From Swiss-Prot:
Region (Disordered): 251-286
Family matches, as PROSITE patterns: GNK2
Name the record gives this protein: Cysteine-rich repeat secretory protein 9
Organism field: Arabidopsis thaliana (Mouse-ear cress)
Family affiliation: Belongs to the cysteine-rich repeat secretory protein family.
Source superkingdom: Eukaryota
């Protein structure tokens, strides 16, 4: 399992839970992280709590109808706004499962917080006492990437830039809802070939301009923070972006030129002596060494494999102390 780095960008006054679960079953959504805003709280049994729980129940019901939904519950000052967004390439059943899990966990982890967001690999759920519909938001965000470098970094950077420019144009100019585009391409170069899988997605409440800005900022972060890794993904409240490369496949060896033909042997004059046949080639094992019983051993040099070890780096953007 490749070692990975996780980078969080969140305002300083947030607290968060995150996990990268290596032993989850296939039926469980993959939890990435949860961010709660502790500066805006409500009391138990308050109207806000009732509205929050009603909102989350409404999102659960809507998850069977599509990959995106938003909702508003209650009257001011206890109004709660919420949304969910499922990844565009998962099934409706997976979306329902993720949203049901996320709405339960976000209420459990952020018990009395008026604002919170929870990210899974398959979906995102959030709620807030402030309306965020159609608003461009970049934080809180999380970036996950591998420490395995991409093949031929200089050319890979050019390939990746061209590919995401194409995807961002396609997703922002598409009428599909939600904005979602994925692509797979076989990239061939002198060192060999590899498969490049790419994906971009925006929240459908964004207009074309803000969708483009969100994805370009996400790509800038992922391409400058991580040293061109072979795998990376970034989650923000309004868009997500990811890429992955397969193992580099070596090019087939060039056909070698056939060796020059040997000149025909010179005929020797007949000899009057009788010809003695050459003795057959016989391999004789060294004496006093027992014959092996068919087993053998050899040394294998393995790469450094670190299982379940995660390095976490937190960066606080001075200019990004915005509300969730």
């Amino acid at each position: 399992m490749a070692r990975i780095i996780i980078t969080l960008t969140i305002p300083l006054f947030y607290f968060f839970f995150f996990s990268l679960l290596s032993h989850q079953t296939m039926s469980q959504p993959d939890h990435i992280f949860t961010v709660c805003n502790p500066t805006n709280n409500f009391t138990q049994t308050s109207s806000y709590e009732t509205n929050r729980d009603t909102l989350l129940a409404s999102l659960r019901e809507s998850s069977s109808l599509g990959h995106y939904s938003n909702a508003t519950e209650g009257l001011s000052p206890d109004t709660v706004h919420g949304m969910f967004l499922c990844r565009g390439d998962i099934t409706t059943a997976s979306c329902v499962d993720c949203v049901q899990t996320a709405t339960t966990e976000i209420a459990s982890n952020c018990t009395l917080n008026k604002r919170a967001v929870i990210y899974y690999d398959e979906c995102m759920v959030r709620y807030s006492n402030v309306s965020f519909s159609s608003e461009l938001e970049i934080v809180p965000s999380i970036t996950i990437y591998s420490l395995r470098s991409a093949p031929n970094p200089t050319r890979f950077n050019q390939t990746l830039t061209e590919k995401f420019s194409e995807l961002i144009f396609n997703v922002s100019s598409s009428s599909l809802v939600p904005y979602f585009v994925e692509d797979q391409e076989r990239v061939t170069q002198s060192e060999g070939s590899y498969d490049l899988d790419t994906m971009v997605q925006c929240s459908p409440d964004l207009d074309i301009f803000n969708c483009t800005v969100c994805l370009r900022v996400a790509f800038f972060r992922i391409s400058t923070c991580c040293g061109l890794p072979s795998y990376a993904k970034i989650f923000t409240p309004k868009c997500l972006l990811r890429f992955q490369t397969s193992v580099l496949l070596s090019p087939p060896p060039s056909p070698s030129a056939p060796p020059p033909r040997s000149p025909p042997p010179k005929s020797s004059p007949p000899s009057s002596l009788p010809q003695t046949p050459s003795p057959p080639l016989v391999f004789t094992p060294p004496q006093n060494v027992p014959n092996p019983s068919g087993s053998f051993s050899f040394n294998v040099l393995k790469g450094n494999v670190i299982f379940g070890r995660i390095v976490v780096t937190m960066t606080a953007l001075v200019f990004a102390l915005v509300d969730l």
